Amino acid sequence: MKIKNILMVTTVLILAACSDFLEPDSLSTFDTEYVYSNVDDARKGVNAIYSYFGQDAFRSRLSNNMAGNTDIEHQSGWSNSADRYQIWDLNALPSNKDLEIVWTFAYRAIRDANISIGGILKSSAFNSSDPAISKTMHHLLGEAYTLRAYWYSMLIFYFGDVPFITEAPKAGNDFFLPKEDRNVILAQVIQDMIDAEADMLWADQTPYGIEQVNREYTLGMIARLALQRGGYYLKPDLSMAREGDYQEYYQIAKDYSKKLIDLKDRPLPTDYRQVFMNECKFITPVNSDILFEVPFAIGNGDVGWNIGITVQGGTTALHDYGSGNNYMAIPPTYYFSFDTTDVRRDVTCALYKVNTSFQEEFIGVGASANATNIAQGKWSRHFLPAPPGKSTAKGTGINWPMLRYADVLLMYAEAENELNGPTGEAQGALRRVRQRAFPESYWATKVDEYINTVSAGKESFFNAIVNERAWEFGGEMIRKYELIRWGNYAQKMTETVDGLKKLADDAYNGTGTLPDYIYWKRDANGKFTVLNPNRKLIAAPDETWTRSSFLLDLHDNTLTYDEWITRDWAKYTNGTVRYIFPIPTVGIDNSKGVLKNDGYGFGGG
């Protein structure tokens, strides 16, 4: 039975009996000593932590919606006052329900992780004389530590300093904890994972492979959170800073990414598209690119509903794949940042949607075009192995990638460069990622010459890493966290807006070389084909091609530029980006006066 199915019937007794965060009146009465006395029940106890990935807090919020806006993914927050729009527009109030959901379920996940950690450490099975039992219990402990670290990482990215709870709820505990310094929290959860990882199992040793936290993922998370701890962050006075010990954490990131490379190296799959097609087809290979992906069961998960290629469905549609939207658009500046021979572009950026007749048709980038604009092309409900039904929408069961091996390679390259400059080791890690991105016939120029050029100095190599991560992970919604820790959030947003304006001006004035119009058709097999994705054409060679406005739609005859160009990133380009949000009202109220929204310009409420 796959873990995704187990999680659908998660330990109800444990969940039902446990208290909400900062609500001490309903402590768990379940016998944790019994639960963690044996491997099978301990597994169920740890499964309770996974269950929160199936809640909206992660399924549609943290995994994608709340990770905008960036230079490669965006939405028009100013166009609506609903909760998610407030977040995109960086003006969310403490009453925002999306913030409340994330806060509440993050602390519930942390609570259940603490229950598991405490129960496992006290269990006689943890130090059993049976090596198999002891090994499994040690692995479960590592899972719990790693899952707890993930939720604290997210809380810190969105709320800054937060209460740090490391014990299971029990009578006599102080439930009204003040904020803890984010650096203290990150240092501790990193150390927890460091202490646990050596006793964990590799994905190919676990029952559920990459659908279960494994040693590969924990090693990668040590590196990822070390870069977060060593990176820049927003302080309450709205300045960006990083700690004086940041190099120590870059060293940790280097050491633990290198440890994974040394102990469990694997070639990157040569077919970049197949990495994500596997998720849409419910294929979960171990020792491949994806180290851990959230295991959504059929009927759960929003991939292919609110992220991915738009599919127009419904009861009158001529297909049975249902309906899927794309909340986060890809700006054309990102599309045109790719080298035209980079295979990742046409996987990541979908210039088409699927209509009710189950035909692929062009979508544009302006106000007059389909509102979804360029979509994340890595996932779609019409890639599913079997149509889920005309009226289906959410619940595709497509897994969500949490960490890939390509990420580990690039984290290693980044950390090595920060500490020692663009050494041969740093170049080698970058080379492995770029080699997959280009046909081998282009390696001499697009890989070797390119890397030689960007390796001229530490800064140029860092900029190459910034770009490579954009091209490699587009649509996977991790860019926001990277821009934060790099301290270049506002810079990249400004570059995006300026770039969009230039595309609009060049198309309108006829001075550009990029496609003001796109010529497209469906080939004999019904496949969407674009004649001129990279250049302007005066006319199509024959009448089989349909002409649709493309970059011309960025220009507005009244406002000069489409309104979304000047407004989607308006609060991201005027000085430091205030990416921190207020603690939601429920957190303030339940703290009995301990917590306040002080700092960050919130006024202390």
State each model region's role:
Residues 336-405, 597-605:
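Flexible, polar/acidic helix-loop-strand segments at domain edges
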Residues 19-84, 160-162, 186, 194-199, ...:
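An aromatic- and glycine-enriched ligand-binding surface/loop that stacks and positions planar moieties
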